[in-house]
């Protein structure tokens, strides 16, 4: 059978989006791995699946697969594309959309200028909820990699993140250190690794090594986690503008227990069909 799909991106973080509300198919990890290959498939960072909800309090169910076939809990840039997609496909007429993910409910607001704001909910810092192996909760933790200690913040935005402060993201060892942090035994479900360079109280540069995808042009949950870490440690104040390789995201966070609000673009690239 042929499935219709849409290729989209949020600041270069690119997605294949499937509507399984009006189409019916059983998508497996092997399909994400096959389609995600940039040489022999469609090529993407993540596969986003739109499903009808089981929960009557939400509008849609949102599933995410990495290009390596692993299913993950959350994707912030994908959430913005999800909102744009369901409106463009007339699956809803709402501009405020409630969506159920593996990690909980998020709220998407589509603005008149095409930007999309995502209420990501409050960040989680308790190590067991990230999950992260630590004796007690702290603002920062020493993490040993190849005999060297690195100071990291550990936070969950529905998915796990480690955040490191660096002097210059251009020379940060993202491709060397990123995969080692991703697969560190203290992160039992692996982790996304963010490298943040603080410019001033409201601006920073960021690169993210994503779990199961490698370095991407942008990572929405990574931007949220980096902003939360920077504000928590007193490096920055809300609101925060983060410049990633693919462009800029705006993050607002009022403090512990409060939701993180992320705003940025969502772009449709092309429509296609793929054989299942």
Swiss-Prot record:
Alphabetical list of InterPro entries matching this protein: DAP_epimerase_AS, DAP_epimerase_DapF
HAMAP family noted in UniProt: DAP_epimerase
Annotated GO CC locations: cytosol
Organism annotation: Pseudomonas putida (strain GB-1)
Family in the record: Belongs to the diaminopimelate epimerase family.
Keyword Amino-acid biosynthesis: yes
Lineage: Bacteria, Pseudomonadati, Pseudomonadota, Gammaproteobacteria, Pseudomonadales
This protein's pathway: Amino-acid biosynthesis; L-lysine biosynthesis via DAP pathway; DL-2,6-diaminopimelate from LL-2,6-diaminopimelate: step 1/1
Record-marked site positions (Could be important to modulate the pK values of the two catalytic cysteine residues): 161, 210
Disulfide bridge map: none
GO BP annotations listed: lysine biosynthetic process via diaminopimelate
Ligase found in the keyword field: no
Its EC number(s): 5.1.1.7
Catalytic residues in the record: 75, 219
Protein name per UniProt: Diaminopimelate epimerase
Subunit structure: Homodimer.
SUPFAM superfamilies cross-referenced by the UniProt entry: Diaminopimelate epimerase-like
Molecular-function GO term, any one: diaminopimelate epimerase activity
One Pfam family it belongs to: DAP_epimerase
Record: residues binding substrate: 13, 46, 66, 76-77, 159, 192, 210-211, 220-221
Function statement: Catalyzes the stereoinversion of LL-2,6-diaminopimelate (L,L-DAP) to meso-diaminopimelate (meso-DAP), a precursor of L-lysine and an essential component of the bacterial peptidoglycan.
Keywords: Amino-acid biosynthesis, Cytoplasm, Isomerase, Lysine biosynthesis
């Amino acid at each position: 059978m042929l499935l219709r799909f849409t290729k989209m991106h949020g600041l270069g973080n690119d997605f294949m989006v499937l509507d399984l509300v009006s189409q019916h198919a059983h998508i497996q990890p092997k399909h994400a791995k096959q389609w995600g290959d940039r040489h022999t498939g469609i090529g993407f960072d993540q596969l986003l699946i739109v499903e009808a909800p089981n929960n009557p309090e939400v509008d849609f169910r949102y599933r995410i697969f990495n290009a390596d076939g692993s299913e993950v809990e959350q994707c912030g840039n994908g959430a913005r594309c999800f909102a744009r997609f369901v409106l463009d496909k007339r699956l809803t007429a709402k501009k405020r959309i409630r969506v159920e993910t593996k990690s909980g409910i998020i709220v998407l607001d589509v603005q008149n200028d095409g930007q999309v704001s995502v209420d990501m909910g409050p960040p989680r810092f308790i190590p067991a909820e990230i999950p992260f192996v630590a004796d007690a909760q702290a603002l920062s933790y020493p993490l040993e990699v190849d005999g060297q200690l690195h100071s990291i913040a550990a936070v969950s935005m529905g998915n796990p993140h480690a955040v490191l402060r660096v002097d210059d993201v251009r020379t940060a060892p993202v491709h060397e250190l990123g995969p080692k942090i991703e697969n560190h035994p203290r992160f039992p479900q692996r982790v996304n690794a963010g490298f943040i360079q603080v410019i001033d109280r409201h601006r920073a540069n960021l690169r993210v090594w994503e779990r199961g995808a490698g370095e991407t042009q942008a990572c929405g949950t990574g931007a949220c986690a980096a902003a939360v870490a920077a504000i928590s440690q007193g490096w920055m104040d809300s609101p925060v503008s983060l410049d990633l390789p693919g462009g800029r995201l705006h993050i607002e966070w009022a403090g512990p227990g409060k939701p993180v609000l992320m705003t940025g673009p969502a772009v449709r690239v092309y429509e296609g069909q793929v054989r299942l």
